Amino acid sequence: MMDFDERVPCSSNMYLPSCTYYVSGPDFSSLPSFLPQTPSSRPMTYSYSSNLPQVQPVREVTFREYAIDPSSKWHPRNNLPHCYSAEEIMHRDCLPSTTTASMGEVFGKSTANVYHHPSANVSSNFYSTVGRNGVLPQAFDQFFETAYGTAENPSSADYPPDKSGEKAPAAAGATAATSSSEGGCGGAAAAAGKERRRRPESGSSPESSSGNNEEKSGSSSGQRTRKKRCPYTKYQIRELEREFFFSVYINKEKRLQLSRMLNLTDRQVKIWFQNRRMKEKKINRDRLQYYSANPLL
């Protein structure tokens, strides 16, 4: 012990806990020799940068652990805007190599190991495989299948298979032809709405009414969660809501004009306005109860 103290006197030297050797005092007048001196590797100057020794980059270790090629084989960051479009660059940001390379350039090589963790590779590889819903990964597809039923055939969820299916396309074609000959403001949308509306009505025709009970039992057992049936298209609902906004009650002349414009029957427009008035009444009642229960609002 005395021999060691004779070789390295404590008065002229200083012990750094991050190092395994002694550094003399005059070395702190400038940057130490073990730190990189190039300006590109040090874009920012930190007050504590002289105390951090240069260690082995963590990037190479993590790439070796997960059997991915080192970051030197990837394209440089500054060449990305010239070679790829903006969308591809956005997708490439999810890759672990470019993420760590950009962090190394922004924060300097001395602090790259602080911002990089081995779990980043796992998370990027996990979330890069997007499931069927387009947002969550593939592991969450099982929850969407149980919640919404079989999403592969939404048409069969809307309409149960009926025995008069051969007559429905003929009726739909006839209504499409008549609507195209009329040439109203909502031609294509009204034809699509007419076709969707004719399909459930054809199932209740007198020819196929004998097998309705069998169809209902088969459809209920085949699919547990049935989607809500809407006989009106979005365009028709928008026009009906606009008319309801101006007047809650509609006269016969306006009703006939609306049914002609939206390719609906007079009875359908009348029933829609009745249902909409009941809905508005319920909304007002619930709103009144809510504000009476909360007097501070």
From Swiss-Prot:
CDD domains recorded: homeodomain
Record carries keyword Transcription: yes
InterPro entries in the record: DUF3528, HD, HD_metazoa, Homeobox_CS, Homeodomain-like_sf
Domain of life: Eukaryota
Region annotation (Disordered) ranges: 151-230
Molecular function as annotated in GO: DNA-binding transcription factor activity, RNA polymerase II-specific; RNA polymerase II cis-regulatory region sequence-specific DNA binding
Composition bias, Low complexity: 167-192, 202-222
A biological process from GO: chondrocyte development
Keywords: Developmental protein, DNA-binding, Homeobox, Nucleus, Transcription, Transcription regulation
Gene3D superfamilies: Homeodomain-like
Keyword DNA-binding part of the UniProt annotation: yes
Signal sequence region: none
SUPFAM superfamilies, per the entry: Homeodomain-like
Location(s), subcellular: Nucleus
Role according to the record: Sequence-specific transcription factor which is part of a developmental regulatory system that provides cells with specific positional identities on the anterior-posterior axis.
Family (UniProt): Belongs to the Abd-B homeobox family.
Name this protein carries in UniProt: Homeobox protein Hox-A11
Gene from which this protein is expressed: HOXA11
